[in-house]
């Protein structure tokens, strides 16, 4: 009788080993997956800042304000909001998406096109710019570079 009882025991849950590289408790990874959360940081959940990015259309004068996390390129946030901004390479290697920062700060360390003087003049490549504060960007500025 005791043998029959032991064969009917089934584990309710098993925890898969976690990579030593990730150095994350399995419970936090499980909770993240259960809620559908995703992270670029190898399973660790991180907080991200969200900023208001105001786009001033250099051609029409239209103004659009978009919420953008510090882990999203401002061009992607604009497109998510339904805006149609110019772009070409989406890699920071051309000037199609060029804008001018009128206020605030961005991290555009992924870009490889602008030289230091253009950056000092406020030029930004929206396809590879993360907001670092609330900011105002004048768009459609490739012709003014």
UniProtKB/Swiss-Prot annotation:
Transit peptide as recorded in UniProt: 1-48
InterPro entries: 2Fe-2S_ferredoxin-like_sf (IPR036010), 2Fe-2S_ferredoxin-type (IPR001041), 2Fe2S_fd_BS (IPR006058), Beta-grasp_dom_sf (IPR012675), Fd_pln (IPR010241)
MF (Gene Ontology): 2 iron, 2 sulfur cluster binding; electron transfer activity; metal ion binding
Residues the entry annotates as binding [2Fe-2S] cluster: 89, 94, 97, 127
Location of the 2Fe-2S ferredoxin-type domain: 51-143
Location, primary (coarse class): plastid
Gene Ontology biological process terms from the UniProt entry: electron transport chain
Keywords assigned by UniProt, alphabetized: 2Fe-2S, Chloroplast, Electron transport, Iron, Iron-sulfur, Metal-binding, Plastid, Transit peptide, Transport
GO cellular component assignments: chloroplast
Subcellular location per the Swiss-Prot or TrEMBL entry: Plastid, Chloroplast
Record note on cofactor: Binds 1 [2Fe-2S] cluster.
Cofactor: [2Fe-2S] cluster
Subunit: Forms a complex with heterodimeric ferredoxin-thioredoxin reductase (FTR) and thioredoxin.
Family classification: Belongs to the 2Fe2S plant-type ferredoxin family.
Task performed by this protein: Ferredoxins are iron-sulfur proteins that transfer electrons in a wide variety of metabolic reactions.
Name of the protein this chain belongs to: Ferredoxin, chloroplastic
Lineage: Eukaryota, Viridiplantae, Streptophyta, Embryophyta, Bryophyta
